[in-house]
Each structure stands twice: as C-alpha cells, then as structure tokens.
C-alpha cells in the first residue's frame, strides 16, 4: 500500500505484512543513575495473581453451573522505533518494567512514579511465542474443552495490537501472531472426522458490522437471544476450516478488505475493529451407545443415550487504536472514523467501569462493540486482554489511560460455563439408519423364509409323486409276474395229470384181457409209480400255493409302503401348514416391531422436548434439584458449599462425608442406576485415599461392598474405580489381611484376567502390589493366583501397568529376602518358580525409569538368597546385576548390587570363571 500524505484518506489493506515490532537498531538508555538518586513515591495497584487466561478449574457438571473467572490482563511494551530513538534521546523512559515481579512503573515526573501490577508483564524483547503461551493458550485450551473464550488487544494506535494478534509470519515464522498460532493448536487437537471448525471474520466500521470475507455484505444485524442473552450474527459468512493453509488464505483475504489509513502516529492505522470468531464443535467419546439387535427391544430402549457435543467459541478482537485528534492529524473522513473509534472505545470503558464497580446497570447497548463483547466482560467466557503501550514520554497520557483501562478490566468477574449438549440429531440419524437396516434385514429374512418354504414344498411334492409312480409300476410288474408263473404252473400240472390218467387207463385196458389174478397183481405193480408221481405233483402244488402266498404278502408289503408314503405326504402337508403359520406369526411380529419402533420415535421426540425444556429451566433458574439418586448425590455435593461458607477450605469429598454420612454413600453402591454406582464408588475411592477415613470405611462394610462390586458387576468403569479404592485400603496392614480373608486376591485376579483397559489393569496391579508387601501373606498370595495375575497383566504393555507389576514383584522379593535373612525361608523364590525371572531380565534395561528402578530392586533382593543364585546365573540375571553395580543412577541400588555380588559364593565363582572384575 502506498500513501501520499500523513493524513491520507481511507484505503484497503492488500494483504502485505505489517511493520514488525522489532526495530532495526536498539539504543541502550541507562537511567540507573537517575533512579538511584531520586526517591520515588510509588502507588501499587494489586490484583490476585493467577495464571493468565485461565480462571478457575473446568466445570464438570455439564455446563449448568458457572465457575468464577476473572478477566486476565497482560501488558506488552513496544520497542522504540527510529523516530523515537532520535526524538526522545534526551528524555528518560516513562515506563519501567519489572517482569519478574509482574509490575510496571509509570514515571509521572522526576520524583513520583505509579506502580501497577498485572497478570503478566511482557518486555519489548518478548517473543510472539511467549506472548501466545501466556495470553492466549489457556483460553484456546478452554475453547477445546467447550468454554467460550475471548482474546482482545487494546492500546494506543501504533503500539502493536495487530502485530500481536494478526501477524501471518509469511517472511519469518517466529513472527506469527495469536490468530495463526491458536488455529494451529486447535487443528492439532481436533479430529476432522468427528469434529468441525468454522470461522467468521468481521470488522466493526463506523458502527456497522461488515463481513471481511464478503465485502458486499456490509451491514450485518446483531441478534440477541431473549432467553439467555447470547449474541449471534446470522448474516455473517461461515467458512469451515480443514487445514492451516486455508485459514491463512482466509486471514489474507480479510486483511485485504479491512479499512486502514495513514496517520501521523501510524502509516497503516486500523480504522475498524476486527473480530475473528472461531466455532469449535467436538463430539465427546462415551461408552454408551445403541445396543445390538440380539439384546432385545426392552434393553435397546433403556440404553438410548444421545452422544454429547461440546461447542466452544473463540473470539479474537483486534481493537482499533485510541488516538487524540491533535496528535494523529486526522481530518475529513479520517476524522469521522477517529470519532467513531473513540466513541466505541469510550462505551467499552464505561461498561468495564460499571462491571468493576458492580453497578446494577451496565450500558452494553450504547455501542455495537459492547453488544458484541457482552459475553466477554461479565458473561460466561474466559477472557484475556493484552494492552499494548509505547515507550515514548510524549504519549504519557495515552499510556496512562491504557494502563488504567487494563487495571479496571482486571476487576471484572466472569462466570465461566461449559457449553455441552446432547446431540439428539445425531442419535435420530443413527436410529433411522438402524431402523432402515432392520427393515431391510427383516425383508431379506422374510423373502428367504418364503423361498425356502416353497422349495421344500415343491421338493416334497416331487418326491411323493415319484415314489408313488415307482411303487405303482413295481407293484403292477410283480403282480403280473406272479400271475403268469401261477398260470404256467397250473397248466403244467393239468397237462401232467391228464397224461398220467390216459396212461393209467391204457394200462388198465391192456391188463383187462388177461385173467383176473394176473390183472390184479400187474395192476398193483403199475399203480405204485403213478401214486409216487401224484405225490410229487401234490408237493409241487403246495410249493405253488406257498409262492402265491409269498406274492400276496409282497403285494401287502408294497401296499403298506404306499400307505407309509401317503402318511409322509400328510406329515409334509402338516409341516407346510406349520411353516405357513410361522410365517404369519413372523409377519405379526414384524408389525409389532414396527409399532414399537414408532413408539421409540415418539419417545425420542418426547426426550428431545423434555431435554429442551429442562435446559431452558436450568438456564432460567440455575442448577435445581432433580429426582433420582445421582442428582441427589450431586446436589449434596454442592449443598455444603452453599450452606456453609466456612467449609471452603475443606475438600469437596470431606464436606460430602460430613454432610451426607458414610452409610448413605455406601448404600448408593447398590443402586440400580449404573451412573449412580459409578459416582458413589468414586466418592468412596477419594475417601479411602485419606488414611483417617480407612478404618471407618472398613468398619461400615465398605471393603465388602467394593469386593461385591468386583464380583457382581461387569462395568469396567466400576471395576477400575473399585480396584483403585481397594488399592488405597490395601496400604494398611490390617486391611490387607481382611482383603485376603474375604477372597479379595481371587476377585482381583479375575478382574485382571477379564479387563482390557490399561487404567483398570493399573489399579488392580497397584492393589496386588500393596498386598505383596506383607510378609504374612506370601504363601497365600501365591496359592490364590496373585503372582500369576501380576505376570498376566504384562500383556497390556502400558508403562503405568508395567510399573505397578514391577513394584509388586519388588515388594514380594523384598519380603522373601527378609525371610531368608531371618532363616524362615529356604529353597528357591516363589517368583522364580512362577516364571517371573525371565520377564524381570527382559525388562531390566527398559527406558521407563519407574519400571527399571523396581526391577533393579527386585533383582538385588532375589540375589541376596543363595538358593536363587544358580537360576539367576542360568537366566542371565547375574549380568544385569553387574550392569546395575556399575551403571545404575542411584547410589543405594548400585551399592546393594555390588554388595550382593561380592557376598554370594555362586556369583563369585562364576565371575572368576569368566574373568570378570567387579571391583
């Protein structure tokens, strides 16, 4: 951009880089002598020190209750430019910074100085990275967690506000401003698959809101929600950001459209307030979701929990610089711009004064700037303000005004709220997809069912028809064959009989001519063969009769088989009827399911309406008590804080313990609602962390209840918290024996075998590790699977889990070493018998310090018992002891390893054999 005069007219930025805060040359001005000789009267303005941009801790209750958070203010000094180095060479500095004390001294004259204290004091040498980390990074982290956040720069024109916020760093990446660095952090933390980032870039020019991304949109209306007072700009361009490069291009486009002018104080003075709005929408990962079809409709109805969405909004405001007309030389249209800028900044100052003085009326509606920043001052956003000042004594009045603005802003308290809501739209879409899948699957199954019935019916009919034809043909053929055989046999018999009769008659006639005696004797001799032949014919006749009977029996058998096939056909028809009936039942079931699905849709709509109504009520009336054990418990957590301000120094769990009572808390461990049980277990675990509460918890049956939770529940969250509570109780020797007597080691081992979450395994391993430190429980701990459970948890590979496993092994080895020294332990270590030595040797050189330290101690304790020496030599543990005695970072462990090696005959013999010197 080029201008022709110091009071040049308005122009647009073309995207070129602004002049740097850094000067090409620096002149060291020494005012030490003056300061030493002048006794200054200083007035110290104090504020409570806290981390810049923070506020209190995050709200964990879904965003309904706010958390107080003061506006955080940092001051940044601009280096002298070339003109000031020449013009102010004879003048002492009017500003003295004390960054280590977070103080600023403003010299009024040679005798008086005012001292101010800020949340952060940034010298002229402070890098852009440091400015971002102390001013903006906490606010950006809060936005990622669902809070609204505001970062704003205020100061005289030409003091580096735009450089601090909007520098792109095209020539030097170290010059990147807060806008660029904030987007880098946001993109690094979100997942673009499930989360979204959208950006609007606006300017407030002459009391009109204009879109820097669309210059034609030059009068955007400000809309306020009458219910909660939220301010929105529905007419602004909203651009979704997917990568850093697109965001930089967007900033360049906006800077090119922003109004700027050449004045006496700044060659490129901003004539409008620039506002960057970044909306971050994040889906929170939960364990609850829709159940599968196999779990049944009733269970699916109970587990309909919508996903949680957190919405955070980051507002970065680059205010136009305040200026005095006689110094800036503004005239004409530039003068009108300066008046508008000063009026809006004056309105902002009035609002901050009213908030700092707790006035009943805050004039937010006096200016569009204050309407846009309503949530930033006295609202629900985390706000960080950086005020920029110059070193020149010529502008002492403007510098004083800027400092006093920052001091008043530090008195403003915001109520920080998390923006969290249920994503009913996502749940509805997911239910619709599941409903469509169920309908398609039902149609496919019904079609396959009908096709299978038709196939079975056709196949049965074909088989029956084929069987009937086959057996009918066989019966007819067999019948004809037997009839033919029978007729042929009868015919043969009749022919033989006729021949025999004729032969017999001829013989009788021939013999009749002889005398009577001869005839009689001869006749008897000839009749005998005929009688024999007749008897043979009778036998043949009997055989034929038997054959006929057999044929009839075969016919009857075939008829019986035919009847059987007809019965099979009848049963097939009955099966077909049954399948048809089943099909009708399935159709009715489908209609019933569709009705239930419609009911679920109506319930979902009712849930949405109820949730909206509840959210509105909470926004209007604050956090009220609701029904149910969980809300009762959470209300009891908050109630002591409201009723008894004197308990502010006590932890929340201790106040809950005094107000509610241990028995009431333990009774909630048996509640039907899983969330109530989880909250109750967390409270018991926090109480168990205090040694003073452990005896009361055990006497009230808390230990038994925790063990029953491990036994009777399958929720891994409950397992994790319950195991942590048991680990806290297991730090006491008396409680350790009670845990063993009540079967606690078996329940912990079972939980470890079924758990997959590293944090659950870490809690279980910590509990077993505490039990391993008891001398009296060694044998019982091993027999009930405690050592095996510890070694089984190394499958996880998580460093925290492995550290607890190593600690348990070290405790166990220490107890064995003590027993061996006292003469009550003989034979090999139980750890070596269970195969722990190989794992110890494999992980002795691990990079994780906590794991390595416990393993080194375990090796030293195992080596102190001579009965373990041969196994340790065989497994290579001796070489690890040699390494520990030489390279261990801890002197006590190194000395213990050396003393163990030199006192063991087995190790000394092996080392001499290998010619290894350990001196």
UniProtKB/Swiss-Prot annotation:
GO terms for molecular function: ATP binding; microtubule binding; microtubule motor activity. Keywords: ATP-binding, Coiled coil, Cytoplasm, Cytoskeleton, Microtubule, Motor protein, Nucleotide-binding, Repeat. ATP binds at residues 155-162. Disruption phenotype: No visible phenotype. Residues 70-412 form the Kinesin motor domain. ARM repeats lie at residues 650-689, 691-731, 733-773, 775-814. CDD domains: KISc. Residues 52-66 have a biased composition (Gly residues). It is found in: Cytoplasm, Cytoskeleton. It holds the Pfam family Arm. Residues 291-301 have a biased composition (Polar residues). Expressed in leaves, guard cells, trichomes, vascular tissues, stele of the root tip region and columella cells. Highest expression detected in guard cells. Interacts (via C-terminus) with NEK5. D-BOX motif functions as a recognition motif for the ubiquitination machinery. This is Kinesin-like protein KIN-UA. It comes from Arabidopsis thaliana.
């Amino acid at each position: 951009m080029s201008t022709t005069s110091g009071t040049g007219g308005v122009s647009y930025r073309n995207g070129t880089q602004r002049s740097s805060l850094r000067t090409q040359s620096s002149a060291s001005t020494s005012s030490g002598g003056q300061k030493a000789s002048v006794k200054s009267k200083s007035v110290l303005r104090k504020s409570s020190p806290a981390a810049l941009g923070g506020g209190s801790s995050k709200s964990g209750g879904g965003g309904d209750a706010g958390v107080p958070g003061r506006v955080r203010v940092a001051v940044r000094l601009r280096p002298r430019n070339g003109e000031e180095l020449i013009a102010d060479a004879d003048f002492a500095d009017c500003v003295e910074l004390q960054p280590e004390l977070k103080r600023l001294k403003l010299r009024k004259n040679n005798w008086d100085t005012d001292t101010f204290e800020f949340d952060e004091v940034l010298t002229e040498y402070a890098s852009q990275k440091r400015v971002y980390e102390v001013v903006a990074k906490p606010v950006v982290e809060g936005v990622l967690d669902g809070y609204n956040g505001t970062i704003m720069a205020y100061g005289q024109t030409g003091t580096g506000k735009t450089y601090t916020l909007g520098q792109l760093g095209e020539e030097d990446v170290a010059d990147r401003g807060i806008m660029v660095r904030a987007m880098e952090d946001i993109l690094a933390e979100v997942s673009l698959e499930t989360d979204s980032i959208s950006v609007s870039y606006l300017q407030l020019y002459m009391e009109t809101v204009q879109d820097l991304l669309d210059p034609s949109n030059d009068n955007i209306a400000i809309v306020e929600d009458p219910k909660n007072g939220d301010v929105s700009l529905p007419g602004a361009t909203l651009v979704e950001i997917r990568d850093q490069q697109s965001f930089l291009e967007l900033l360049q486009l906006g800077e090119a459209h922003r109004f700027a002018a050449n004045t006496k104080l700044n060659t490129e003075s901003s004539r409008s307030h620039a506002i960057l709005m970044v909306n971050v929408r994040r889906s929170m990962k939960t364990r609850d979701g829709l159940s599968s079809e196999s779990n049944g409709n009733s269970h699916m109805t109970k587990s309909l929990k919508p996903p949680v969405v957190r919405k955070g909004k980051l507002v970065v405001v680059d205010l136009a610089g305040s200026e005095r007309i006689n110094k800036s030389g503004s005239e004409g249209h530039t003068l009108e711009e300066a008046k508008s800028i000063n009026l809006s900044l004056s309105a902002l100052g009035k609002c901050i004064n009213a908030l700092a003085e707790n006035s009943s009326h805050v004039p937010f509606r006096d200016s569009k700037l204050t309407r846009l920043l309503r949530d930033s001052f006295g609202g629900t956003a985390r706000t960080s303000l950086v005020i920029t000042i110059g070193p020149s004594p010529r502008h002492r009045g403007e510098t004083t005004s800027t400092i006093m603005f920052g001091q008043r802003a530090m008195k403003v308290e915001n109520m920080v709220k998390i923006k969290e809501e249920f994503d009913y739209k996502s749940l509805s879409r997911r239910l619709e997809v599941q409903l469509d899948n169920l309908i398609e699957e039902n149609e496919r199954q019904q079609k396959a069912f009908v096709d299978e019935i038709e196939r079975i019916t056709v196949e049965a009919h074909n088989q029956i028809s084929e069987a009937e034809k086959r057996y009918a043909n066989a019966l007819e053929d067999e019948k004809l064959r037997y009839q033919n055989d029978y007729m042929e046999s009868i015919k043969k018999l009749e022919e033989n009989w006729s021949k025999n009769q004729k032969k017999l008659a001829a013989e009788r006639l021939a013999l009749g001519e002889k005398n009577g005696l001869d005839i009689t004797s001869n006749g008897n001799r000839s009749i005998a063969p005929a009688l024999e032949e007749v008897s043979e014919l009778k036998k043949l006749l009997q055989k034929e009769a038997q054959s006929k009977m057999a044929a009839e029996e075969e016919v009857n058998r075939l008829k019986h088989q035919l009847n059987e096939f007809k019965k099979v056909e009848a049963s097939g028809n009955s099966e077909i009827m049954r399948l048809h009936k089943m099909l009708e039942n399935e159709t009715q079931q489908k209609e019933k399911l569709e009705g239930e699905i419609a009911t679920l849709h109506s319930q979902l709509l009712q849930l949405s309406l109820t949730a909206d109504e509840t959210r509105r009520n909470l926004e209007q009336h604050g956090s009220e008590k609701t029904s149910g054990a969980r809300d009762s418990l959470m209300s009891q957590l908050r109630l002591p804080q409201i009723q008894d301000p004197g308990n502010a120094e006590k932890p929340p769990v201790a106040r809950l313990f005094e107000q509610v009572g241990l028995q009431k808390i333990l009774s909630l461990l048996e509640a039907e609602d899983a969330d109530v049980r989880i909250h109750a277990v967390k409270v018991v675990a926090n109480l168990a962390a205090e040694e003073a509460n452990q005896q009361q918890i055990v006497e009230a049956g808390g230990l038994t209840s925790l063990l029953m939770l491990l036994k009777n529940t399958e929720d891994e969250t409950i397992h994790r918290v319950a195991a942590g509570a048991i680990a806290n109780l297991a730090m006491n020797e008396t409680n350790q024996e009670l845990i063993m007597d009540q079967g606690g080691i078996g329940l912990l081992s079972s939980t470890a075998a079924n758990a997959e979450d590293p944090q659950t395994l870490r809690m279980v391993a910590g509990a077993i590790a505490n039990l391993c430190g008891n001398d009296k429980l060694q044998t019982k701990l091993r027999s009930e699977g405690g050592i095996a459970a510890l070694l089984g948890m190394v499958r996880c590979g998580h460093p925290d889990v492995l550290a607890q496993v190593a600690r348990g092994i070290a405790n166990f080895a220490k107890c064995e070493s003590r027993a061996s020294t006292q003469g009550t332990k003989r034979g090999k270590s139980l750890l070596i018998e269970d195969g722990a030595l190989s794992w110890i040797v494999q992980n002795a050189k691990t990079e994780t310090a906590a794991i390595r330290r416990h393993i080194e101690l375990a090796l030293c304790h195992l080596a102190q018992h001579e009965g373990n020496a041969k196994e340790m030599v065989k497994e290579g543990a001796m070489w690890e002891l040699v390494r520990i005695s030489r390279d261990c970072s801890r002197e006590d462990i190194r000395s213990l390893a050396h003393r163990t090696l030199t006192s063991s005959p087995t190790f000394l013999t092996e080392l001499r054999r290998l010619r290894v010197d350990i001196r």
